[in-house]
Amino acid sequence: MTKKLIKTTLKAVLGVCLSLVAVLLILLIWSYGLGFFYDSNNIKYQDEHLEYLKSEYYTDTYVPCDEQKMADFDIEKACADGVKLNEIAVLGTHNSYQRLAVFPKRCLVTLVNIITFGKVKNESTFDLDTVTQQLEQSIRNLEIDIETVDNEGDIRFIVTHDPIFDNATTCYDFEKALEEIALWSDHNPGHIPVYLLIEPKGEVPSVKNMKPFTIDYAIEFDKVIRRALGDKLLSPDFVLGEYDSFKEMRENDSWPALKDCMGKIAVLLHHNNITDSYIALDPSIRTQAMFPMLRFEHIDLPYTSFILENDPAAAVKNNKISVEEKKVIVRTRADDYSSFSDEKYELAEACGSNIVSTDFPPRQVRPKDHTFTLGGYTIRLLK
């Protein structure tokens, strides 16, 4: 009787395990299938969203964003007093383009999270407001991931976390994403400068004409930026001014005045596999469209202006050197979607970095969600 019971129990357990495996495989195939063919959905979403924005902007009812409400200082007075670009801090977002994952992926990751007792984090429910909604909430740093598509010389850049498995995005076509940001900027003249952080993908799956981001593609990417942003671009050339290098500019405490940067958009290139090649195009960075974001160990190089210090504890530790003495602009992260803590938030608020990124910004769509801010603000004076 006992042997029979054990045998029956083992059969039942095996049956449950096989059923779970079958469900996981179905969800995996379904997720990949939807993700692979989700491009048309992304394109349709973006086109309709842009048309909607244009219809809203060009009416008498649109009211520009009141970013003064989200600043802990008088912006007009700060501009009059000569506050510099590197003397303010702004709140940013991570994966700023992210839409809710497709249904089967949410089911798949949730199931895996349950099976592994939480060891595999459930990040499938992460999404953000649209880029425009974030800008309306006075978010002044956006971060997007770039994939390169090269169809026999027809080069495009798309915005996605994963071109197959996690392909839901609010701004699929990069040039149209810039159009959306520029459109908002047009209708919010004199806004606090926006930092657009670009993270290109060096390794990509060999599908959909995707290619690794190379220096040749970076040159094309610069052209897209200049074409889309025009005189809205806060360029390295403008920031350098009369100086031969960023190091010289920083040593003379000569970041441009905030008032001269209002209404502009600076594009930052996340440290990646082609950073050195991008710098080598012109080591002064004067002729490039993007500012290379380097690491703390690169702080004394002549072309260093922005650095990544994603750990807020390290940002606190190095603040006196990086922000106060060396006058670089520092970006750190307060959290990620699957991990946040009061301790980390306290560090992020106190670190003195110029750009603090969060996965939990103030939201227009779900305002009661958990949020992180800079002491209740998204724009802060560091002086």
Regions found by a protein language model. Name each.
Residues 12-17, 21-383:
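Catalytic cores of phosphodiester-bond hydrolases, prominently lipid phosphodiesterases
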